[in-house]
Swiss-Prot record:
This is Increased recombination centers protein 22. Residues 22-169 are lumenal. Residues 191-238 are cytoplasmic. It is found in: Endoplasmic reticulum membrane. It holds the Pfam family TRAP_alpha. Residues 1-21 form the signal peptide. The gene is IRC22.
């Protein structure tokens, strides 16, 4: 049976709304929503080639990362992958903390005994912390749509670190500097300029004023030595 994309999109929307929103208990355990098929599926994160299934994958908010799926059809009938989804689970409780957007894709059909692969991009906007990422594939099989859940991957979501050379940060710094410079200029014109001009007027000498002249004063001769007085009298006599 061939499913159209609008039909698949309607099914995915109904599945997410019914399975996870209407039934709070469904968010604690998704095993009851999955169907056992002879269909092996695995995935990797290409930009993290050294991260294995038991390792911690680090991804960043605001950035897209790619999930590369690989699968093998071990059933005796054709299987078609028609949609992708998944969820981020709590590390301790297993409860779903955020769903990946369930999206229809152009059908990827795998005949019995054959393998295939495809990639899907995921964008993030989550609270920075550690999760268990569990991708899901929506499968068209035996005239029905079923859900196949992949393995979990420990994933730490982080905010993008801010660099001092980030263009947006540099622009913000330039705006702040220009703002402070403008405020300083205004403050100088309002208060500083008047203050410095007033100080200069106080210290400026008056025009035409004569410079101070040293004047002689009479000195009491009682404290002068007697020899010094005799010398002065002798000079006068001469």
């Amino acid at each position: 049976m061939k499913f159209s994309l609008p039909y698949v999109a309607t099914f995915l929307g109904a599945f997410v709304a019914g399975a996870f929103a209407a039934d709070p208990e469904a968010s604690k355990d998704t095993t009851s929503q999955t169907v056992t098929l002879q269909f092996a599926v695995d995935y990797s994160i290409p930009h993290l080639p050294n991260v294995g299934p038991r390792d911690l994958a680090e991804v960043y908010n605001g950035e897209e990362f790619t999930i590369a799926y690989s699968f093998t059809n071990n059933e005796d009938k054709d299987i078609s992958i028609v949609g992708v989804g998944g969820a981020f689970h709590d590390v301790k409780t297993g409860a779903i903390k955020s769903n990946l957007t369930a999206s229809p894709i152009e059908a990827v059909t795998v005949t019995p005994g054959e393998s295939g692969s495809f990639s899907h991009k995921v964008s993030l906007n989550l609270v920075p912390e550690e999760y268990i990422l569990v991708p899901q594939l929506f499968i068209a099989f035996d005239n029905d749509l079923k859900l196949v859940q992949a393995r979990g991957q420990r994933t730490e979501v982080k905010d993008v670190p801010i660099s001092v050379f980030d263009p947006q940060l540099l622009l913000l710094e330039a705006i702040l500097l220009a703002t402070f410079a403008g405020l300083g200029y205004v403050a100088y014109n309002i208060w500083g300029k008047r203050y410095f001009e007033g100080t200069a007027l106080v210290n400026k000498p008056k025009r035409g004023a004569s410079p101070p002249v040293a004047t002689a004063k009479s000195v009491d001769s009682d404290w002068l030595p007697e020899g010094h007085l005799r010398q002065k009298k002798t000079k006068k006599a001469n």
